[in-house]
């Protein structure tokens, strides 16, 4: 029977199939061995392992090895410094047009050319790429509101200002003049503001500030004139030391003589500073203070008067007498208590203690409960219930 069953299985199954004897409880369906999928790992097969063929340097021509020029390569332009500068200036001009400052910049440029004596050929070519000139440097220090409106006129004093005085100008003076020319008035009286600026708005009246709207040329002339006046007043001269002393408040010689008359014992430094330090001996106070001290404490010494402290002086004989009196009174108090009465008092005290011990009831001996007893456990639970 077993041979017939095995033959039947061989006929049903193909040659490639592996036949196993059927186990009890196993289905009669033929089980084939599962084939594992073939996986190609990266170290077995990878596109990166297909290396391209590396050609030798002999294949390259010398013309190909040379640097690519702007004519050979599309989209690449070799720009020199002049072209780059012109591009940058054009970009700046475009930005000025966007900010509505192109006309102002044009006025600065024309004023700079006429004031510095630039030749006609350079004026035609333009001053693109040149460093900022003194008028433009001055314009950079001005506030934005003035920078939009001020233009530099072409006059003779402008050339002198640029050539001589502008490098010596201080930032503080420029800012002071600029703030003065903006026309900001902070007068607290509205009537005065209305007199100076009748076209004042409601907001300007409320804030007590009026913005002067003037001609840009007039503002520029006022600005340059004030700066020139301030710089011409300096002229690089040193200040007189006497004037410096006077400005600092140092007294003059005549004032020093007056000080010597008032305070004859004054030193030179005290005369210069105008301060006199009174030298007083600590052991010799003022006469009025001594009189007051003598009135209150007649037996006071000179040092006690100076320090304001008086030490009481007592006769030693009086002190000895007081000491003897105190010792005598103490001995009398001790002798008043008789020596024979002491043992009797001790005996009575002992008898009282013995009687109290006899009459005292014996205490009951109570056993201390252990920590694990029921009573202690209940107490613990009561504590927990309280909380």
Curated annotation (Swiss-Prot):
Biased composition (Low complexity): 336-345
Region (Disordered): 233-256, 327-374
Biased composition (Basic and acidic residues): 347-359
Domain of life: Eukaryota
Feature: compositional bias, Basic residues: 360-374
Cited Pfam families: FAM153
PANTHER family reported for this sequence: FAMILY WITH SEQUENCE SIMILARITY 153 MEMBER C-RELATED (PTHR40712), PROTEIN FAM153A-RELATED (PTHR40712:SF2)
Family: Belongs to the FAM153 family.
Protein name, UniProt field: Protein FAM153B
Native source organism of the sequence: Homo sapiens (Human)
The organism's taxonomic lineage, starting at the top: Eukaryota, Metazoa, Chordata, Craniata, Vertebrata
